[in-house]
Swiss-Prot record:
Sigma factors are initiation factors that promote the attachment of RNA polymerase to specific initiation sites and are then released. GO terms for biological process: DNA-templated transcription initiation. InterPro entries: RNA_pol_sigma_54 (IPR000394), RNA_pol_sigma_54_core-bd (IPR007046), RNA_pol_sigma_54_DNA-bd (IPR007634), RpoN_core-bd_sf (IPR038709). This is RNA polymerase sigma-54 factor. One of its GO terms (molecular function) is nucleotidyltransferase activity. A motif (RPON box) lies at residues 387-395.
Length: 414
């Protein structure tokens, strides 16, 4: 972490400035101009201008940015967060099912449809395509209704299943019309035709239409880019408001000299905000380098960041709230890069569970691994201390049978 410590400002100046201007650090980039103006209401020396670039695509182009939710330069804040909050048990009970679900979310286009190749996505995650598809089908139970469907017809079928109609004949009529949308007029004489059409007209088309209507511009604070085979961090300085001073007009007034000092303090606070966000970017690049090269996230605690800046976790949490980072893999909330660690170690629950799954997948079918042996292998790999009941708990959460039950199942399949 030397790269960060070498750049940190003196603690006294940092603490004094943050105490006075903490709202500047915590505000969202799109709200920063208003926050600065509130601080400068009674200061005639300050002029605040917004030089924000509305479209930063010329500076930073994400792959398939127009197609994918997480890769949108202009993207809905709430659709991703709405879906992410639903990726929990019992619908997604295992680490694997949750990982697949998050991958599906990342593959949604801006209308809410999933147009990715399932076989290819499953291969990337190391799961069977049937397992991947099974998880995708569970999206029929999520909101907004129809999300995750492959096309309009499947989106309507998802929404129909969510209606839970008491009348089975009406259900079948509606389903028949959906499957034959191009020639639905052929069923116009059916008894339930009009009622079925009324149901269809109430469906969302496309599934994410309500989010398209209230699309919010997400402006990243940071860019992490690969330039000349080197990963670098850049602050989105073009989107920051500027503060200029008209100090030459007033030199004799003590009152205005005081206002000049206040103005310079405001500039210092803004510069400190930039420096703080930039250093957060440096830390993320250092800790999550593998992620920015296309691999998995590493466990990273907010406490690590708080210790670097000598501030409380709650202060740092508020500082990164509603702030975004853009990289080749998309646009992400900065909080996306932090996880809850296991027993204050460097290893997260998710990493442990993934390794447990890998061990079971590759175990000797004649002599399946006991929980005690799995514990030994995990402690050896990650250099940490655990208890066997934790391994048993993780195994049960992942719906993995005991070693004796697995041995019996293996023999039955032989």
């Amino acid at each position: 972490m030397a790269i960060l410590r070498a750049n940190l400002s003196p603690k006294n100046k940092l603490n004094a400035t943050l105490k006075g201007w903490l709202p500047i650090l915590q505000s969202e980039l799109e709200d920063l101009e208003e926050v600065l103006k509130q601080n400068a209401l009674d200061n005639p020396l300050i002029k605040i201008e917004n030089k924000r670039i509305k479209n930063f695509s010329d500076r930073f182009n994400t792959k398939k940015s127009s197609d994918h939710l997480e890769n949108c330069a202009t993207a809905s804040k709430s659709l991703f967060e709405t879906l992410e909050s639903q990726i929990i048990p019992p619908l997604f009970p295992t680490e694997t099912s949750q990982k697949i679900a998050m991958d599906i979310i990342s593959g949604l286009n801006n209308e809410g449809y999933f147009e990715e190749n399932i076989e290819e996505r499953a291969k990337v995650l190391g799961v069977e395509s049937e397992v991947y598809e099974k998880v995708r089908k569970r999206f029929s139970y999520l909101n907004p209704a129809g999300i995750g469907a492959k096309d309009v017809k499947e989106g309507f079928l998802f929404q129909l299943d969510g209606r839970e109609l008491d009348n089975n004949e009406l259900y079948e009529e509606t389903r028949k019309i959906i499957l034959n949308l191009e020639k639905h007029h052929e069923f116009s004489k059916d008894f339930y035709y009009e009622k079925a059409l009324k149901i269809l007209k109430s469906f969302k088309n496309p599934p994410a239409i309500e989010f398209l209507e209230k699309e919010i511009e997400v402006i990243p604070e940071l860019f992490i880019l690969e330039v000349d085979n080197e990963m670098i961090v850049r602050l989105n300085d073009e989107s920051y408001p500027t503060i200029s001073l008209e100090e030459n007009r007033f030199k004799d007034s003590d009152y205005l000299k005081e206002k000049l000092k206040e103005a310079k303090d405001l500039i210092d606070a803004l510069n400190l905000r930039k420096a703080t966000i930039y250093k957060i970017g440096l830390m993320l690049l250092e800790y999550q380098y593998d992620f920015f090269k296309g691999k998995e996230l590493r466990p990273l605690k907010l406490l690590d960041l708080a210790n670097e800046f000598n501030h409380s976790v709650s202060t740092i949490s508020r500082a990164i709230s509603n702030k975004y980072l853009a990289c080749e893999r998309g646009v992400f909330p900065i909080k996306h890069f932090f996880s809850i660690a296991l027993d204050n170690s460097e290893t997260s629950n998710a990493v442990i569970k993934d390794y447990l799954l890998e061990l079971i997948k590759n175990e000797d079918k004649k002599e399946p691994l006991s929980d005690a042996k799995i514990l030994e292998l995990i402690e050896e790999k990650f250099h940490l201390k655990m208890v066997r009941r934790t391994i048993t708990k993780y195994r049960q959460l992942l719906n993995i049978a005991s070693s004796s039950e697995r041995k019996r199942l293996y023999l039955m399949r032989a």
